[in-house]
Amino acid sequence: MIAFNLACYASVTGRIEEAKERLRNAIDLNKDVRILALDDEDLRPLWDWITDLQ
């Protein structure tokens, strides 16, 4: 969950590319994180990107 939390922090501070990288790492560790991310307001700027992930 640390990678997920760091992704949230990066997102709310406008560091979108860093947020994507950290979220990708979190999803690689636990696929269920993708579902959590789509419900987290901190990650709203990434929702389209998350939806497009394979």
Language model regions located:
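Start-of-helix register in tetratricopeptide repeats
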Residues: 1, 35-36
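Canonical positions in the second alpha-helix
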Residues: 25-26
